[in-house]
């Protein structure tokens, strides 16, 4: 039962409840008028009786997200890249703005205002939770609507867990996600593709772009290919290539906190003391594993490329470190995604 006490010019409702650990605690709520206190006495007694009383908890948004993160990662068997990306969202897009706010005090309006703030926030303003000094040009490059929708989706999931944990009666997340405007990407026709390939003199870049254009492969899928994935005699001699893995660079800390079954292989460090590693991982979805047909020009280029790899190995005179990938550096080590992207930009 609850009781009402007068304390100076206000009235307090006193009651007892059990916290999440089962300990008996005493609650106090103050009101300006006796009528407000009487109404609250009736409602709190009903809540305590039917189990709808919200146990007070000072957990902050940051604490809740870092509690939710490993559970969600383990439950859904996240890839290391997904884990790293989610940590970055929490550190750089949520904690600086909502991190210290207690989750039981977060209102839907607060989140609407938060999304509005993000829409005016420059990309890269925070890195690893530390505010950066930006150039005038960088200050004009704002977060995309897609990034804000991604934050919304993450918070929606995390706050639903808080409800399940009994920390909230209902989620404060707005029903509608922030709107996102998508820009149409220009699709190259065959003539444009051929013209682009003719300007590329680097054989590694040429083959990578050729694979991307003809087979619609992502960078990670291209670099994840191995010579054994190619069957030059399949499809009545047309030839096929099978996509079944992806190569990514990921933080070593993320590898320790994600499902090891998602990883096929971790390549040795090329730089001593590196905090990241190149890994071969499972494809994003089951549909990502597929077998594709080669065109005649692509088949010819792949045959020439395999011969180049053999010549590279001979030229290294025993110092060649065959990583087993289709795309390799002259010393046999794998080509990293960031290296391929850099070559493409230059």
Residue spans of the language-model regions?
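Short, surface-exposed polybasic/aromatic micro-patch for ligand or macromolecular engagement
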Residues: 2-58, 285
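Conserved tyrosine-mediated DNA breakage-rejoining catalytic core shared by Y-recombinases
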Residues: 7, 192, 225-307, 318
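Short regulatory "switch" loops immediately downstream of catalytic or recognition motifs
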Residues: 16-19, 113-136, 231-234, 244-257, ...
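Short, Lys/Arg-enriched alpha-helical recognition elements, typified by the DNA-recognition helix
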Residues: 57-163, 177, 324-326, 341, ...
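Short, basic (Lys/Arg/His-rich) helix/loop patches that form interaction surfaces
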Residues: 123-127, 198, 202-205, 215, ...
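Basic, Lys/Arg- and aromatic-enriched nucleic-acid-binding interface segment
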Residues: 127-145, 149-151, 164-227, 235-238, ...
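Arg/Lys-rich amphipathic alpha helix in sigma70-family domain 2
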Residues: 160-169, 304-307
């Amino acid at each position: 039962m609850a009781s009402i006490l007068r304390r100076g010019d206000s009235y307090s409702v006193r009651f007892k409840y059990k916290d999440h650990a089962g300990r008996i605690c005493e609650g106090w709520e103050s009101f300006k008028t006796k009528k407000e206190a009487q109404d609250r006495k009736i409602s709190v007694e009903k809540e305590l009786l039917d189990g709808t009383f919200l146990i007070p908890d000072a957990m902050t948004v940051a604490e809740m997200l870092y509690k939710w993160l490993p559970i969600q990662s383990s439950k859904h068997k996240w890839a290391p890249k997904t884990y790293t990306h989610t940590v970055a969202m929490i550190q750089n897009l949520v904690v600086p703005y909502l991190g210290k706010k207690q989750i039981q005090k977060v209102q839907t309006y607060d989140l609407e205002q938060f999304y509005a703030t993000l829409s005016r926030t420059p990309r890269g303003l925070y890195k690893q939770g530390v505010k950066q000094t930006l150039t005038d040009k960088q200050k004009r490059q704002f977060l995309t609507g897609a990034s804000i929708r991604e934050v919304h989706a993450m918070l929606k999931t995390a706050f639903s867990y808080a409800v399940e944990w009994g920390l909230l009666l209902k989620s404060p997340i707005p029903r509608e996600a922030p709107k996102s405007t998508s820009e149409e990407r220009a699709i190259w026709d065959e003539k444009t593709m051929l013209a682009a390939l003719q300007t590329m003199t680097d054989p590694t870049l040429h083959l990578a772009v050729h694979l991307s254009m003809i087979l619609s492969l992502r960078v990670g899928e291209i670099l994840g290919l191995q010579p054994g994935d190619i069957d030059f005699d399949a499809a009545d001699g047309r030839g096929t290539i099978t996509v079944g893995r992806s190569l990514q660079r990921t933080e070593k800390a993320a590898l320790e906190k994600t499902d090891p079954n998602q990883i096929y292989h971790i390549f040795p460090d090329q730089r001593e003391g590196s905090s990241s590693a190149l890994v071969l991982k499972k494809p994003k979805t089951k549909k990502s594993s597929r077998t594709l047909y080669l065109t005649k020009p692509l088949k010819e280029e792949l045959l020439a490329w395999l011969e180049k790899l053999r010549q590279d190995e001979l030229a290294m005179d025993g110092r060649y470190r065959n990583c087993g990938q289709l795309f390799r550096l002259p010393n046999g080590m794998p080509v990293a995604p960031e290296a391929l992207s850099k070559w493409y930009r230059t």
